[in-house]
């Protein structure tokens, strides 16, 4: 229980909180309800870093090589993102830089799959990319916990500025908020939280997109108040999804990323249908 179940539950809660919080933060920053943590390219870069650890064989020789590779990928992508953006970049530049990072990391991951030495190596990479909490230990929790806590602190500190940003960038600036510093804190916080989450679990989609949508009616048009609520909502969603796949009579065990996508996709279809009726 202590060696397997407890670390898995703790890690699931940490990852879910990171994804939910980051999703709300990105939607608040970009003022777009369709934004999600992967929009800045950090999660794709973290996934590529872990894929490199798998491809090179480092993951077989060192237990923590896989998450460390993901964290290294996230750190390098964050540095590159700040270099590309500079001090005075706006929201459009941020999105374009994120698209470029996503495209490059995705292409590099596909290249690693294409050049895999054998089908088993390619299959290992594909299965890891699907996302899972299986076989994670307390060492994984201790590795990412400080990074996640730092990321959460950065994002939660932006709550007043995000509320002001709903009035427009000019109004927020006139109220005394430094928009460049706001973007830096949100990008840095997302990089720390989501990068470390992807590094230990693989890609788990839809949590950062769906959870803020579900919980936004509870707080109204206040993105700052949505941050903490979405974090807890993300933690609950990931824990419920992981519990469901463990109890499902299917072997081998389903991947967590598959389950969250199966939960998230119907919700998005219903959201599209509701928006179509309201239009």
Descriptions of predicted regions:
Residues 1-279:
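Alpha-helical transmembrane segments in inner-membrane proteins
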């Amino acid at each position: 229980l202590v060696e397997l179940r407890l670390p898995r539950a703790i890690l699931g809660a940490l990852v879910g909180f990171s994804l939910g919080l980051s999703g709300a933060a990105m939607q608040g920053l970009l003022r777009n309800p369709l934004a999600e943590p992967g929009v800045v390219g950090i999660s794709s870069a973290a996934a590529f870093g872990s894929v490199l650890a798998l491809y090179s064989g480092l993951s077989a020789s060192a237990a923590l090589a896989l998450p460390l590779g993901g964290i290294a990928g996230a750190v390098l992508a964050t540095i590159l993102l700040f270099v590309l953006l500079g001090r005075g970049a706006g929201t459009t530049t941020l999105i374009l830089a994120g698209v470029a990072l996503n495209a490059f990391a995705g292409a590099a991951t596909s290249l690693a799959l294409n050049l895999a030495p054998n089908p088993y190596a390619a299959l290992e990479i594909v299965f890891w990319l699907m996302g899972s909490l299986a076989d994670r230990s307390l060492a994984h929790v201790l590795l990412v916990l400080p990074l996640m806590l730092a990321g959460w602190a950065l994002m939660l500190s932006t709550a007043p500025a995000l509320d002001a940003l709903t009035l427009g960038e000019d109004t927020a600036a006139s109220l005394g908020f430094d928009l460049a510093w706001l973007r830096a804190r949100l990008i840095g916080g997302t990089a720390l939280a989501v990068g470390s989450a992807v590094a230990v679990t693989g890609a788990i989609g839809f949590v950062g997109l769906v959870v803020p949508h579900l919980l936004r009616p509870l707080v109204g048009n206040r993105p700052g108040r949505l941050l903490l609520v979405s974090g807890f909502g993300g933690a609950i969603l990931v824990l419920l999804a992981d519990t469901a796949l463990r109890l499902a009579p299917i072997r081998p065990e389903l991947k967590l990323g598959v389950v969250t996508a199966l939960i998230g996709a119907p919700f998005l279809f219903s959201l599209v249908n509701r928006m179509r009726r309201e239009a």
